[in-house]
């Protein structure tokens, strides 16, 4: 990427790669941030769109250059050029599709092969859809690999900021960091059931307290 414009020189900027199976909602998710959508750039050589997502914290502005694959993952894995120099990542799956969760270890493997020790958030998208197939008790991969996990709903903006806040705190080495202003987000296309979201959060908290199952370890 070209050097940032002079007025952005002071803003800490981090390359964030967004990975996961096709159709899990990665592009929908990144497009929610309207400024990033307006300022995105296409890098033809590797077929990605880079969305600069700015967030304002109690310690100043922070920017994530979010690399979105433009659907290449449908044709197999991504090239190393996509991952090189990534400083953080979001792995996304669809809670209505078990196979997308089953493929998470493959995405994680490809990512850490190139990037090694970077902070990673695992996101289960589409929690607004009533027919949830991937339940809290089966979501254990993040615990085995020391990742953060959030339920999200890109279309409703539910938990949109959570992955970015967690990554910002890790990258800044500051757990006190907070977002002080919300970015302009696209209006929700769907509404989430607040009660159901609360129930999902409780189920996730309970599942996290349970010992890890060991039957999957050989695969992961």
Swiss-Prot record:
Classification via Gene3D superfamilies: P-loop containing nucleotide triphosphate hydrolases (3.40.50.300)
Where are the residues of the annotated region Switch-I? 40-48
Name of one Pfam family that matches: Ras
Q: Can you tell which superkingdom this protein's organism belongs to?
A: Eukaryota
Tell me, which GO biological process terms does this entry list?
nucleus organization; poly(A)+ mRNA export from nucleus; protein import into nucleus; ribosomal subunit export from nucleus
Q: Where is the Small GTPase Ran-type domain?
A: 10-174
Task: Note down the stretches annotated as region Switch-II.
Answer: 71-87
Tell me which SUPFAM superfamilies the record gives. P-loop containing nucleoside triphosphate hydrolases
Q: What is its main location?
A: nucleus
Phosphoserine: modified positions: 2
Q: Which UniProt keywords apply?
A: Acetylation, GTP-binding, Nucleotide-binding, Nucleus, Phosphoprotein, Protein transport, Transport
Q: Where is the signal peptide?
A: none
Q: Where does GTP bind?
A: 21-28, 71, 125-128, 153-155
Additional remarks: Present with 2460 molecules/cell in log phase SD medium.
Q: What's the subunit arrangement here? A: Found in a nuclear export complex with RanGTP, exportin and pre-miRNA.
Q: Which NCBIfam families match?
A: small_GTP
Q: Which purpose does this protein serve, as stated in its record? A: GTP-binding protein involved in nucleocytoplasmic transport. Required for the import of protein into the nucleus and also for RNA export. Not essential for cell viability.
Family matches, as PANTHER family: GTP-BINDING NUCLEAR PROTEIN RAN, RAN GTPASE
Report the sequence similarity comment from the record: Belongs to the small GTPase superfamily. Ran family.
What's the name of the protein?
Answer: GTP-binding nuclear protein GSP2/CNR2
The gene that this protein is the product of is GSP2
